[in-house]
């Protein structure tokens, strides 16, 4: 496949991630930190995000089992995940973390459970979408990494 076409596909996928609310401007700022010395910076940061966020979610699941209805503990775990999402630009996951924290504030265990399932689902969908995006960028080569979606 032609490299220009791959770059267009990557740009289109990135735009759709913004249009669908998966990403926010923070992700562009992460990508802007890439340079010739570290052309895979954004992909490496995203990889670390998923490694860390997966660990946080596993710790959270353990906290739910060991400390049922300990809303303060649950909120602390979710705040950590929300912060990670904010720093990488994972907008939909971050927004669901906010919903979860609201349920914690209401001490609504059922709402927390439903919201956490949404967090996990959004996290999994974003992982798949980002994997597709970075795969296209790797195929296109370094010149395909510096495109900012229109209007962002």
UniProtKB/Swiss-Prot annotation:
GO terms for molecular function: histidine phosphotransfer kinase activity; protein histidine kinase binding. One of its GO terms (cellular component) is nucleus. Disruption phenotype: Dwarf, narrow leaf, sterility and small grain phenotypes. Pfam families: Hpt. Residues 38-140 form the HPt domain. One of its GO terms (biological process) is cytokinin-activated signaling pathway. InterPro entries: AHP1-5/YPD1, HPT_dom_sf, Sig_transdc_His_kin_Hpt_dom. Functions as a two-component phosphorelay mediator between cytokinin sensor histidine kinases and response regulators (B-type ARRs). Plays an important role in propagating cytokinin signal transduction. This is Pseudo histidine-containing phosphotransfer protein 5. It comes from Oryza sativa subsp. japonica. The lineage of its organism: Eukaryota, Viridiplantae, Streptophyta, Embryophyta, Tracheophyta.
């Amino acid at each position: 496949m032609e490299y220009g076409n791959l770059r267009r596909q990557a740009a289109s996928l990135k735009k759709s991630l913004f249009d669908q609310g998966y990403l926010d401007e923070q992700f562009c700022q992460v990508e802007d930190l890439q340079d010739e010395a570290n052309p895979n910076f954004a992909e490496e940061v995203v990889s670390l995000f998923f490694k860390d966020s997966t660990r946080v979610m596993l710790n959270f699941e353990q906290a739910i089992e060991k400390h049922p209805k300990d809303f303060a503990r649950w909120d602390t775990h979710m705040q950590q995940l929300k912060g990670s999402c904010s720093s990488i630009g994972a907008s939909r996951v971050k927004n669901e973390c906010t919903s979860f924290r609201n349920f914690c504030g209401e001490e609504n265990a059922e709402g927390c459970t439903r919201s956490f399932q949404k967090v996990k689902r959004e996290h999994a969908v974003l992982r798949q979408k980002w994997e597709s995006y970075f795969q296209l960028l790797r195929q296109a080569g370094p010149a395909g990494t510096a495109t900012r979606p229109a209007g962002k």
